[in-house]
Amino acid sequence: MEFSTKALDWSKAGQNGFLATKTDCLVVGLFEGQNLAGVAKALDVATKGLVGRLVKQGDFEGKRGTQLMLHEVAGVGAARVLLVGLGKEADFSDKAFADAVRTAVRALSSTRAASALWCLAQQAPQQRDVAWAVITTITLVREAGYRLLERHPGLKRANANGKPNGNDKSSLRKVVIAVDTGNARAATQAVVRGTAIANGMELTRDLGNLPSNICTPTYLANTARGIAKRHKLKAEVLGRKQIEALNMGAFLAVTKGSEEPPQFIVLRYDGAGAKQAPVVLVGKGITFDTGGISLKPGEGMDEMKYDMCGAASVLGTIQAVAEMGLKLNVIAVVPTCENMPSGIATKPGDVVTSMSGQTIEILNTDAEGRLILCDALTYVERFKPAAVIDVATLTGACIIALGHINSGLYARSDALADALLQAGRRAMDTAWRMPLDDEYQDQLKSNFADMGNIGGRPAGSVTAACFLSRFTEKYDWAHLDIAGTAWKSGAAKGATGRPVPLLAQFLMDRAA
């Protein structure tokens, strides 16, 4: 889908103005109430009071979540006019703006409209700028139009309606986002950034949604190489022998039961000078998690293909950073393998030595994400990072604590935590800061090693983060537990692309 911006003089709306633009659909937002303003007022004037009459007669009141499609409206160059309800202006929030975009996309998807002049961006919430509105519009429109089976048609020959794949996709191909003339430059940059973030989210969703017999550790490694080739990044992929040479005993313990070879992926984006310390993103890449010898229940186990969504989001984010051309250095690190049971798999009670030299009693083989991450967190010390953020579908306990709205955020540094929280709010990819008190560390005590890999049922997400914190003493570190936000179940089943928006916004803010 192609996005662009068009700077318009809203005072010139008539025969030679923006309302004369030839397009398949003109999208206009209306606040609830009879006081028309901005584009809505200009449209009302050009159509000789049509909008006002619709409002007065109660045919369209501008209530949030409502829309009205008009056809062949006199005085307008568009074949269709879509009125979108914005709700009460006093209550117009980020979420209300997002709801308006989604409402418009749903309405357009039921038509054959291939192009649209989108006049919602200048009606962003009061606290947001045009760049936010443009980026948000692009990511939401692309999110709504995402279809895995269009991108990987070999997975399924027909869609839910029995038609060949692609027959149910939206016709929309070109969206021109209208902005004020004074915001043209910022809006143009926002199109580049919004498109890059949307591309990163789609890559993340693809990798998460693909079945584990396709998206193997080797597939992830090849994907990383492809990103590097397209965007001129530096890629390094370590195999089992190199991982063994690094003494990554915790990572290797997880790999023992699988015949799929483990991979350790490093991608480098050098957008700033060599003297600038990089931001390192570490993503958990368990491409399928059976639980190992501590076997998971069969029900819902198919969703354990999503256990590599941390890795997917890290790859999606560094691709977005490269496409945006941000002036900072970013490194993505992905330890990836399967967690499988077998005759040689790691057993509960086994003790292993991590790359850091600390020993770990593996009390539960289903607490494997922290094992592959701890060696990766030790490995990244060599980069002397400005900050390290690890991303993982780490604990079911985080879902119990936070549900599916907020990702769990852990950090020792208030400054790093606040920057991530602020980025999440702006990107509408929110997180909630969780405790990391030293008192929780006692739950990880082991009689036979420096620590156990689990801390019991109480505060399970917290103790998992405490475990990781023991390997991050040499740099500023944050942990995102995305177990509740990386994918959805049920009718809307699929990867969400989170937390790419949060991470991308954090890096954009840092590069500013």
From Swiss-Prot:
Cofactor note: Binds 2 manganese ions per subunit.
Subcellular location: Cytoplasm
Keyword Hydrolase: yes
GO molecular function, one term: manganese ion binding
Residues the record marks as active site: 296, 370
Residues where Mn(2+) 2 binds: 284, 289, 307, 368
InterPro entries: Leucine_aapep/pepB, Macro_dom-like, Peptidase_M17_C, Peptidase_M17_leu_NH2_pept, Peptidase_M17_N
ATP-binding as UniProt keyword: no
Gene3D superfamilies on file: Leucine Aminopeptidase, subunit E, domain 1, Zn peptidases
Listed EC numbers: 3.4.11.1, 3.4.11.10
UniProt binding sites for Mn(2+) 1: 289, 366, 368
Swiss-Prot/TrEMBL keywords: Aminopeptidase, Cytoplasm, Hydrolase, Manganese, Metal-binding, Protease
GO terms classed as biological process: proteolysis
Location (main, coarse): cytoplasm
Cofactor(s) of this protein: Mn(2+)
Swiss-Prot/TrEMBL catalytic activity: Release of an N-terminal amino acid, Xaa-|-Yaa-, in which Xaa is preferably Leu, but may be other amino acids including Pro although not Arg or Lys, and Yaa may be Pro. Amino acid amides and methyl esters are also readily hydrolyzed, but rates on arylamides are exceedingly low; Release of an N-terminal amino acid, preferentially leucine, but not glutamic or aspartic acids
GO cellular component: cytoplasm
Function: Presumably involved in the processing and regular turnover of intracellular proteins. Catalyzes the removal of unsubstituted N-terminal amino acids from various peptides.
Family from the record: Belongs to the peptidase M17 family.
HAMAP family, per the entry: Cytosol_peptidase_M17
Name this protein carries in UniProt: Probable cytosol aminopeptidase
